[in-house]
Regions:
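Small-residue-rich transmembrane alpha-helices
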Residues: 116-117, 336, 374, 410-480, ...
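Membrane-helix entry/capping segments
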Residues: 54-99, 127-128, 140-145, 180-183, ...
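Negatively charged linear elements and acidic catalytic determinants
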Residues: 1-102, 301, 336, 481-494, ...
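Short, strongly hydrophobic transmembrane alpha-helices
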Residues: 94-121, 125, 369-371, 417, ...
Length: 884
């Protein structure tokens, strides 16, 4: 009851403030009057009695303030007073306010952008019901995220921990809705996919397990909301319409809800089809291949009460069963759980490392901004030392002054945070619609949600309190009588030491960021000059899937040969070859490889997992891949000829021990087929620029037909002219075949996309750090010059040379620059392990990097000190002495 009574009283005081102030004024005056009456009765004159009573009473304003606080309503009123005072002070210093707000906006905006990406891709679960219980499955020591279809069926039917398990795979297809045929991306999914995720359609219905009755038995598609909106203009009559996928009829069953875009965070398909129709989509049937495990990703909801550890144990018992039952196909069947969305550790690991490292660097930017503003606030408090001393002498409490300083700091930080958040939202909208890889369904679904807003608010408040705390020591150790007596507006306490420390911290952070930026640039340059195993220059790519136009089997091979011959006939074309998957951009399929003497073809007995490509005879000529030994394929290496392969040098070393004995030797594939090595080519990069040398084998396409292919057209003609000739040539062969034409160099940019993004991100942070460093050094130098103008004038009047004047004015700033740069460079070198996760071939100990950092910091110092130096040298001693 006492608490409620107190609360009611405090609320009442907010609405009766004027009345209570009047009553308090009367009471205080009455108190002083009574004391004066007592003194007058003791013999003092009336005037002297009133004066003595006021002296005994003390500061009238302070007593009034204490009474108001005791009444409980002053706090809110004083907060508004502090806010009004802070706004007034900021309006009086528009330059300081603009610099402070811009500094914080850059720093908090950068942190908001990085955190929004981290939140969208890593922290936030998929947008499905009960997402916290949704897990994906990884397998084996390498934590592969894909399974074969038969293994998936066993996992689904034999586990006791999941409500259901669904599987999915990304594929491309040609679609004809009645207009011009075009390419599209889809997810091939099991019939229980939508049921397992517990989502409901926006329009129509989903397909279910009951719709699957064998291969090609469920010709249905479910559209994403975005595809329905873009291609069918929100036509609700689309349900039941028949469209052509690879010239096979499929019926539209429904439209998914607007918020659901699939189960891979960065891949947005156009629609979903049942996986049992995989042969119609991809032109081949791998559903019965138990050993073909590089295909399906699996996920499902844990049953209520089942822990992840229990689920892993349950899955491993199924894995033990599979190893015993199918020893030839299933090995290393140990399982792990992962959060779905980023395809497990294969992509999730590097992505988490990159974004975490980027978040740390963005945090350093914010720390540098706080150091910058802390230094400015210390200088600002120093310039207001006389004002603060007078207020203290007149009875103001130090805590009230500090509260006003903190209010000013927090107000600036909130304004800067709001501006930075607004800028980050604008940038995030651009990132959301940006397609980094135009030929792939990849985008960054980043949005500013409550987590981002909360993080921005938290960083704003923390920043305000952090740099607002810098002048605390100065205020608490101020001797008002000494300051007033000396008439100084200069030093307060030991502010120089604090400002020096803040500047060193700021410069050190800048040096770390500049080091990171230069390391990223050097890493990217090394990437661009790596030995890819092919030459992208002067080569065009024609990418298509013949299955999109209804070609399969021998018809697809015949059409591929016709396309190669027709393109070779174009004037200026030197060679044309095809490959089923481009190195780096699409990665490659891998296959277990066994020695020729091995009869036990279980995966555990494989001597290597080799990258596998299917190529036409002239691919190596078109790609400019160097043949080291043996021969390349011919069109006679068909399905009626002995199985042959061309391998790379690493394959020869790993399988045969030496390239000298590899040509003519045999090895076995996963299916037991004996394959003879007929040639050896140079090593290259196949799945990643960061990979160690990998074994790779190339098989003739006539012995292993593929519908999907990329034609490499090597020419000495202008790419734009050649593109027009290629387009007309392909359309003459089949006007209904979807295809794209790009330069190989442009396509390779997709493989370099992670390195480019890392370089760009670190470069932006490095520039921001440099800007903050310039402002910090400039502020330090300008403040030093302004406070020592009279001293500099006297020195010049006494004959000091310009160099001595500059040393006096700026020597301290450059010493701090040297200390901070050395500390930052050392920290940048020690951060090599972190940088290695962010940038390929990151080597901070590179002499060019070290020299570049030293040069960059020296240039930054000279740039920042230029204006203060000019001011110091332009001092007219006669004018200063006359003013004195």
């Amino acid at each position: 009851m006492k608490l409620l009574d107190s609360l009611r009283f405090r609320i009442a005081t907010l609405f009766r403030r004027s009345q209570m102030n009047a009553e308090m004024e009367d009471e205080l005056r009455t108190h002083i009057q009574h004391r004066a009456d007592d003194l007058e009765r003791s013999g003092l004159p009336r005037v002297e009695a009133e004066r003595s009573a006021r002296i005994e009473f003390g500061s009238y304003s302070r007593v009034k303030e204490e009474c108001n606080e005791a009444a409980g309503g002053t706090f809110v009123e004083s907060v508004f007073q502090d806010l009004r005072f802070a706004f007034r002070m900021l309006r009086k210093s528009p330059g300081f306010t603009a610099v402070a707000v811009a500094t914080l906006a850059l720093a908090i905006g950068a942190n908001a952008v990085v955190f929004a990406i981290l939140n969208s891709l890593i922290l936030r679960p998929l947008d499905v019901p009960q997402a916290q219980s949704l897990y994906g499955i990884e397998r084996g020591k390498d934590k592969d995220v894909t399974e074969s279809y038969p293994d998936y069926l066993d996992l689904r039917d034999r586990n006791r921990s999941f409500d259901d398990l669904a599987a999915y795979n990304v594929a491309s297809v040609g679609i004809d809705t009645g207009n011009n045929p075009s390419g599209a991306w889809l997810l091939e999914v099991t019939g229980n996919y939508f049921d397992a995720l517990a989502i409901q359609p926006y329009l129509g219905r989903f397909f279910h397990s009951a719709d699957e009755r064998g291969p090609n038995s469920a010709p249905y598609i479910v559209l994403t909301y975005a595809y329905w909106h873009a291609h069918f203009q929100d036509d609700r009559g689309v349900v039941g319409r028949v469209v052509q996928l690879n010239k096979h009829p499929f019926t539209i069953l429904g439209v998914a809800p607007v918020e659901f875009r699939g189960t891979i965070s960065f891949v947005f398909p156009d629609f979903w089809v049942p996986i049992v129709n995989q042969e119609q989509i991809e032109g081949t049937n791998w559903l019965n291949e138990r050993g073909n495990r590089g295909l399906l990703m699996v996920l499902g909801h844990l049953k209520t009460g089942v822990t992840p550890a229990q689920a892993v144990s349950d899955l491993n018992s199924v894995g033990t069963y599979l190893e015993k039952t199918y020893p030839k196909d299933d090995g290393h069947m140990t399982f792990f759980l992962m959060r779905p969305g980023l395809t497990g550790d294969w992509l999730g690991g590097p992505m988490r490392a990159f974004l975490t490292g980027l978040m740390l660097l963005a945090g350093l930017i914010l720390l540098a901004a706080c150091a910058n503003l802390g230094s400015l606030f210390a200088a600002r408090a120093s310039d207001r030392s006389r004002e603060i001393a007078l207020r203290l002498a007149l009875g103001s409490r130090p805590m009230r002054i500090l509260r006003q300083l903190f209010t000013e700091a927090v107000l600036i930080s909130l304004i800067g945070g709001a501006v930075g958040l607004w800028g980050s939202i604008v940038l995030l909208r651009g990132l959301t619609v940006w397609r980094p890889l135009p030929t792939a369904p990849i985008s960054l679904p980043v949005h500013a949600d409550a987590n981002v807003y909360g993080m921005a608010l938290l960083l704003s408040l923390a920043s305000g309190f952090l740099f607002g705390a810098v002048p605390v020591r100065q205020v608490l150790h101020t001797d008002p009588y000494q300051v007033i007596k000396s008439g100084s507006t200069g030093t307060l306490g030991r502010r120089i030491t604090v400002r020096d420390l803040l500047l060193v911290v700021q410069i050190a952070i800048c040096a770390v960021l500049v080091t990171s930026s230069l390391v990223a640039v050097r890493g990217l340059m090394r990437s661009l000059h790596s030995n890819f195993g092919f030459e992208p220059q002067n080569a065009m790519l024609v990418e298509t899937a013949l299955s999109m136009a209804g070609y399969s089997g021998d018809d697809a091979l015949t059409m591929q040969k016709r396309m190669i011959d027709a393109l070779k006939a174009i004037p200026g074309v030197q060679s044309v070859g095809s490959v089923d998957r481009l190195p780096l951009y699409y990665g490659a399929n891998d296959s277990n490889v066994f020695t020729d003497k091995t009869s036990d073809l279980r995966p555990s007995n494989a001597v290597a997992d080799a990258m596998m490509y299917k190529i036409s005879p002239e691919y190596f000529d078109a790609a400019h891949t160097t043949l080291l030994a043996g021969r390349i394929f011919t069109w006679h290496d068909d399905k009626n000829s002995p199985r042959v392969a061309v391998i790379n040098r690493e394959f020869a070393r790993k399988i045969f021990g030496s390239a000298a004995i590899a040509v003519g030797s045999y090895f076995k594939m996963r299916d037991g087929t004996r394959t003879q090595v007929v040639g050896i080519v140079e090593d290259g990069k196949y799945a990643s620029l960061a990979e160690d040398p990998q074994p790779a084998m190339f098989l003739p396409v006539l012995q292993s037909p593929k519908s999907e292919m990329s034609l490499v057209v090597r020419s000495n003609r202008d790419p734009q002219q050649l593109a027009a000739a290629i387009k007309s040539t392909v359309q003459e062969l089949d006007a209904g075949l979807p295809f794209t034409i790009r330069t190989w160099s442009r396509e390779l940019e997709s493989a370099l996309f992670p390195s480019r993004m890392a370089t760009l991100s670190l470069g932006v942070l490095g520039v921001m750090g440099a800007v903050l460093s310039i402002t910090g050094i400039f502020g330090m130098a300008a403040y030093s010059v302004s406070k020592r103008l009279k001293e500099l004038g006297i020195r010049m009047a006494l004959g000091a040379r310009p160099r001595e004047v500059l040393h006096t004015a700026l020597g301290r700033a450059f010493k701090l620059l040297a200390i901070g740069s050395a500390a930052g460079l050392l920290l940048g070198i020690l951060a090599s392990r972190v940088l290695a996760f962010i940038v390929y071939q990151a080597t901070p100990r590179d002499p060019l990097v070290l020299g570049g950092v030293v040069l960059a910091m020296a240039l930054l110092g000279l740039l920042a000190a230029w204006i203060p130096a000019q001011r110091a040298l332009s001092v007219d001693p006669m004018i200063l002495l006359r003013e004195e």
